[in-house]
Amino acid sequence: MLTASLLIFSLILEYIYEPISDKGINSIIQKSFESFKGILEDIITKTLILFLFPVALYILINLLISIVGFVVHPFFSFLINLLILFHCLKPNQFRACIDKLEDKEALETHKNNKNFTRMMKSSKLIYEEILSQIFYNSTRIIYTVTFFFLMLGPAGALSYLIVDSYINESTFKIDTKSKKILKNILGVIEFIPIQLTVLSFALVSDFEICVKSYKSTKNEEGLYNYNRTLITNVGNNLVDQSIENLSQENELDVYKNILSRSFLAWLSVIVLFIFGGFFI
């Protein structure tokens, strides 16, 4: 029941406490990357360093957790895992960021809020642009993180966030060539989680619209762009249909309802897998 315990405690803590600054953990990751790069930059290419860093971090974290659990006490290894997952998985903070969109005129005041700009990532800090990217951003912050936690543990979720930050944040300075390669890698990494997210949307919303949107989305510009376009098309078409059927409902409430119901669907399936013995 380790998976269930970590997930439950992480979600409870994230729901109870106000948003906690990630500056400390992000600083540690940044310093670790600089040290890692300093050791290998004369040996291998920068692109390979960027690829190997999350892999090396994943191995080191799991090694540390194993040593702590064996030498000290398993409870402390549980705490380390919980801290990492708490840092990675933030559905409630994502919902809070959507709530901030209620005041369209105040969007400019959030441009220096790193937590908001990371979760509501868009090319411009404009209401319509942010809305158009909500569903893809939800996969970055919630669904793909959950998927890699289930597959690889909290360290796997953290490694995914690092790869995501290469593309979607300014923490790491990446040249155009490396970013193009990393987008191809990220496209492969995100493919299954986004397919599962689309399926969850179909289960909790209008199945027919999801199928039509899925079939109409073509893979013409690479897997990374296909993933973004697919989840955006499916989500936005569901929103349009919901608003048309419920003309009095608040637009942002529709977004939040779809995301909340789909995440509950994920949690329900996870519980079934846990009781089925697929996760410890």
Placement of each model-derived feature along the sequence:
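Hydrophobic N-terminal alpha-helices or hydrophobic patches in metabolic proteins across all domains
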Residues: 1-280
